[in-house]
Structures are given as structure tokens and as C-alpha cells.
Amino acid sequence: MKKYIILAMVALLMSSCAEQITRLAQYPKMYEEKPLSIAVMPPINQTNFVEAKDYFYTTLYAPLCEKGYYVYSPMMTMEMFQAESAYDAEQFIEADLSPFRNVLGADAAMFTIIKSWKRSKIGGSLTAGVEYILRSTKTGETLYHREGLISVDTSVHSGAGGLFGALVDIAATAINTAATDKVVAGRKCTLFVLSDMPEGKYGTKFDKDQTLPAGKSYIKATVK
């Protein structure tokens, strides 16, 4: 019996290893084109929370910079997008992106689709469902695509026992959830989802992360 259990565990381990895919295999066009600069497109908001678009737009800059890319500041490009009627990214998500290459010099454009945005004061969480699509301004090809449903845990545990302790935790959680900045929550979501994105020229692992594991195309997780 013990022999069969060991064999089953080995088979399971081999199966899990076989299913793991590298970043080169998952995102081959990222390594082919090697984009250096990214223009962040205004998010496409599919939720009832109207402000989600503006909040989330400002969260994309830092995480992409940390991945080693030159990113055009959303604050700088916003006026240009509005003047060129590009603030509604829906009309560009499948369109020709060469104008952004010609005007800005951007190698790629990052599109985001906000599919859900929910705050739970009692449970203590901010949950965002976002799809990320990076398209080449040169070829129009999708270079990177990933979607995540990420909950930012804002719960507070005082350590006090009994009914009083539970009430204190509930009250503290509600306050902490309300006080958690939406920009902070959005940035944490982006950092987590883009964690397997191949690094750009200014990253320490540029052109060296091909063999690192890529994540699943859709992820669901809770972060602190």
C-alpha cells in the first residue's frame, strides 16, 4: 500500500512539473519584439463604479516602471488622449495603434478592462477584477495578456478574545477598509497580476527571464 502511495505522489509531482510553462513559451512575442516603452491607455470600465476608471488609471505607471519599462506618465498623456478622443480606449483596443508609435514613440500600449470593483467593509476586503492586454504599436499583435480577480485583505485582528474582541475587530476592519486608498488597492492588484510579465530593458532580468515560470492566464488571489 505504501508503495502505491509513493508512486502516486511521484506521478502527481511529475504531472505538476510537466504543466509548468516558461515565460518564453507563454509570451514569445514579448521576447521577439522586446518593447522598451509603453503608453498606458485609459482603462475600459465595465463596472457601475464610475470613478474606478480614473482611480485605476493612475495605478498602472509605477508597476510597469518596476518591471523595467519606460512608461509615459498617464498625467502627461491624459490631455493628449482627451484632445485626440482617445480617452475612450474601447475604440482602440482592436484598432491600428501606429499613431501612438508615431506621436509618442511608444513601442506598446497597455489596455486594461475593469470587470469588477467591490468593497466589503464587514469582510474587510477590496476586490478588483481586471484584464490586462499589452499590444504592439508596430505589428498590432498582443504581446502580453493576463486577467486577475484580486482581493486586497483589509481585515484587522486585535488579538483580543471574546465577544468584545470580535466587535473591536469588526469595527477596526470597517474603518481600515474605508480608509484604504483605492489607488493603493489598484496598484497591489496590478503588481500581483503582472508579476510574471517579462522584464523590460531597465530591469535586472531583461532578456534573462525566459526560463522562469509563467503564471496562469487567469488568477484569483488574496493579497495583504
Identify the residue ranges that each predicted region occupies.
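Extracytoplasmic/secreted cell-surface and envelope-processing proteins
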Residues: R119-G123
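N-terminal segment of the mature soluble domain
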Residues: T47-F111, E141, A178
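Positively charged n-region of N-terminal signal peptides that target proteins for export
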Residues: M1-Y4
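C-terminal/domain-edge helix-coil "capping" segments
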Residues: C17-K34, K138-K224
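Post-signal peptide N-terminal segment of mature Sec-exported envelope proteins
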Residues: Q26-N48
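Envelope-exposed proteins and targeting segments
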Residues: K34-S37, K67, G105-M110, G124-E131, ...
